[in-house]
Amino acid sequence: MSAYTVSRLALDAGVSVHIVRDYLLRGLLRPVACTPGGYGLFDDAALQRLCFVRA
């Protein structure tokens, strides 16, 4: 399983970090885990979901 941060998820999906954070607030994306520092981590399914929503 790949673990993506918000910035890496945005980069791989070709969208801005602001779009990813907006989708988080709207409930379209959810992190699968959090780092000890509180950063959300996303999996490959989240990347696919983000690409699907953007299409």
Swiss-Prot record:
Keyword terms, alphabetized: DNA-binding, Mercuric resistance, Plasmid, Transcription, Transcription regulation
Domain of life (superkingdom): Bacteria
UniProt keyword annotation of DNA-binding present: yes
Residue ranges the UniProt entry marks as DNA-binding: 6-25
Disulfides per UniProt: none
Record-linked InterPro entries: DNA-bd_dom_put_sf, MerD, MerR-type_HTH_dom
GO biological process: one example: negative regulation of DNA-templated transcription
Pfam family, any one: MerR_1
Molecular function GO terms recorded: DNA binding
Residue intervals of the HTH merR-type domain: 3-55
NCBIfam families from the UniProt entry: MerD
Name of this chain's protein: HTH-type transcriptional regulator MerD
Gene giving rise to this polypeptide: merD
